[in-house]
C-alpha cells in the first residue's frame, strides 16, 4: 500500500527565490531542528541541484533514521523532485511545484508526497494511523519556516 498527501502554501516572494530557498540544505536543517535533522553525506551545505544526493540523519518517534535522497527531477523555477534511494521507506517521492500566484503577488508552492512504509502489514497500519499525518505535519512545519525566511528575504528593506 502507499499513501499520498498534498500541502499547498502561499509565499509572498517570487518563484525563483522560493525554488532556490527550498533547495537549501541549511534551511532544511533549520526547519527540522525538532528532529535534529542533519546532512551527513553527499551535498551537506548550499543548494541542492539536479542529480545531487544528500544523506539526512534525524530522530523520529525516538528512533534514529538515515535517508539518502536524490534530486531526480529539476526544472527551475517550476519543479523539482526528491526521491529516497536508501532509507526507511519502501518508497518516498516528494514533488515540489512552484507557480506564480494568480494575483502575481507571490508563489503557490505545492508539495505532493507519495510514500510507502516498510514492514509489510504492520507498516500499512502505521502508514494509515500515524505516519501520513506525522509526515504531513513535518512538511507543514518546514513550509512555515521556509515561508517566514523567504518572505523576510523578499521584503523591501529601508
Residue ranges and their predicted role:
Residues 1-44, 49:
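Hydrophobic ligand-binding cavity/cleft-lining segments
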Residues 4-6, 64-68, 91-95:
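Short, surface-exposed coil-to-beta transition loops
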Residues 8-12, 57, 70, 97-99, ...:
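Generic structural detector for well-ordered beta-strands
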Residues 81-137, 157-158:
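Beta-strand/loop substructures that line and gate deep hydrophobic ligand-binding cavities in soluble
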